[in-house]
Amino acid sequence: MLSQKEHIITQQILRETKAKNKDNLTRTNAYKRFYDRHPEMKWSLLASFVSRNAGWSMTDLKGELFHPGLTDQQGHLFFTAYERANWLIFSDAYPQLLLYEWSKRCSQPLFHLLPYFSVSRFMSAEWEHFWLKHDTERLLYALIINEQYTIQSPIIQNPLLKKNVFHSIQYLFSEWGHFQTVVFPTVDGHLYGLTIRKFSNVKERITLGKKLAKLLFRADLFSDFYHFMHTVPHTGSRFDFEPFLGIARRSTPFLRTVYPVMTHSLDDQREDWFQKKLSPSLFEAEPLPKQIELTDWYFHKKRQLRFLFSLEHYFLHK
């Protein structure tokens, strides 16, 4: 049984999460604002940047490059995969962040309430550990691990999405050509980022997340990344950063002009992904590759992707 105070807290968290889980823009902004209130929550800033990238991927589907190579059904399924993952991660993670905020406000840990938000047992233990040890790096990694396992079964292994999105020729083109990339722009015209080849592999995504965290918080680059995020409003279009690269014409739309708010449902009795002990290596740091600046790469890959989709269109429609 919850006390009256606990009931008030849980209901407030549910209301706030629902209000800010409206679409990619509200989620991205909520993550950023939470980090500004609690800078020890590194994952929240990383999540905001990754969520920005998800929004850019969504509007790519309606842009000049991708749109001609997709049927309406394919475009809808690709958007559903991006949006559903973005929504599900926020549904799981944001209540955890808010409960931490309430714990600070009350000067006592409230993590025994995590099960009321269907949060994994894995994270209950990690939050308790963080409250005692203040190990920000471990919590960062724990949240990365948790969110990737959270989406593995309902999104990545969903039969419909697996067949029509993650095994589609368009998606395989993207993986083969290194287009599954998360980018961190700067206002002085540089683009940094990392690529994943096997997005459907949960451990590959966890490795990418840890590398992205290392890149984002690198001492010589962090202020540039944060300045971009703090000063450039998120519209969902890559034109948020392309003018800084010298690109004068917008080729992808603003997110809210092409996608209505999508209604989701969440199984309150969803199965906890944490069923067996994890490998300690998941908590180990990952080295960055030599190539982290992708400014020139970005232009080259756009040309390459245009060529690949023209080939796909030719062979499938001749």
Where are these regions (language model features)?
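Functional cation/ligand-contacting sites centered on basic and imidazole/sulfhydryl donors
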Residues: M1-K318
